[in-house]
């Protein structure tokens, strides 16, 4: 609409300018005298022509524009321009002539006659008229050409404006159509937003309907598939029946109907009976399941009750163990005080101290600090002895020692101080417990090693006994000595125990700890082949006498070593769980000197002489009863594998029916 308004304003301005130009032209025509009629006529003619042209041009606005008139107008305009150029030149020439004539007239007026003047005036008048006419024609032509040119320009502008108006109108129509479409779309969108819940509800309903249809279709498919399977199974059954009937029809050796019916009746009765049995068994299974479930529930309840009872008992056991530990600590504290008092007593009496070697110090450090109660419990932890005689003597010695210590304790407890620091008590207790644990571990390792070695030796010698032929060798043992020697041995052992207790009180102020009697070394006899193998010689090589000499030499060494060890440990009261005898051989002299000095200080010089005289006899007397006890509990054809000090070449072999009990002879299988 804005473009149309602009076009209207432009058209109005154009027509206003044309009217002004026409007014100017009319004023110019009125001013020019004499030429008014000609100009009017020419204007009228031109107006008529222009009117016709304007009509033609207005008619052509709707259709197409005539470019031929423009061509003609251009040609006329060119001619008019040429005339415009020629006219001023002619005018200048005429002016010059007119001026020349005036000058000539002024100079020679007197000479010219009147007639000549009349003719000359007429010619001048005619020339002037002609000039004025030419000027009027030129002006009129010029005015007409300018008007035509302007009219044509205005027509062209009008045509352009009409084209623009048409384009703008079409654009407006298209824009109106688009606006209508947009308005419709916006209205639909707004309506859709308002109708969203309805649309969603419709969509959900459609989805539900489709799902129901799917389910129905799936159910139909399933039913159809089942029906197809059933029909297939029926077809197969019918085919089987047909085949069976065909075979029956083809068989010519069939029985009669009565027999077949009788068989069928029997089979049906059996089937019925089987069905009844199956039903009864199913009922029994159900009943049994119920009964078992009840029993399981009862048993679970019992187990829960037992678990609760066990938990309560465990709690009680823990409380009791704590109480026992507290009592043990109290007893240990009392023992610690007693040992301290003994130490103080010995210090006051100026008891002489004896220097000890490194071996003795190591043995004393290994000894644990135990209480009175632990002495009773650790009797069972001592490694098992090879004979009953050793066990009996060990138990007797322990009982005697415990009684002596129990007699000494009440005298010492009366002298204890009533107030002691708690820190010292607990430190002593922790130290004792640590030493006990260390000793138990050492003993357990020693026992395990001994057991392993004994088992290996058993296997080896059983194989050797199976492979080698038996040879009987008579070994003559010394006869038993008198009961006085046994009494001396016991007294000697008691005194050695007392001496060990005094040494412990002097060194560390703790309760003494002693093991049972010593293990005895076993003496074993081997064949020449085994002896040669032990010495690195071939089994068959070497004379028999050399083997016997080696055997006798080795047995003599073992006997001497055993006697020395028994003497030393009987005085010291300590027996290592595992080790070798080489250490004791090297330090034999120093140990004997210390032993003799201690015995002189404790019991006097006379006791040392008695012990020196009775030591070989005592050793023999102690060996004979122990060896005699070893032979009785073990059955024949069995060998005891326990040994002492890790000796790998020695095993005991039982005797076969001793020839006489008084002589003390034994026959040993090699």
Curated annotation (Swiss-Prot):
InterPro entries: Lebercilin-like, Lebercilin_dom
Disordered, as annotated region: 30-51, 374-393, 495-516, 557-580, 609-670
Biased composition (Polar residues): 38-51, 651-662
GO CC aspect terms: axoneme
One Pfam family named in its UniProt record: Lebercilin
Keywords: Coiled coil
Biological process (GO), any one: intraciliary transport
Basic and acidic residues composition bias: residue spans: 560-572, 621-632
Coiled coil: 148-259, 305-336, 420-440
Cystines in this chain: none
Assigned protein family: Belongs to the LCA5 family.
Name recorded for this polypeptide: Lebercilin-like protein
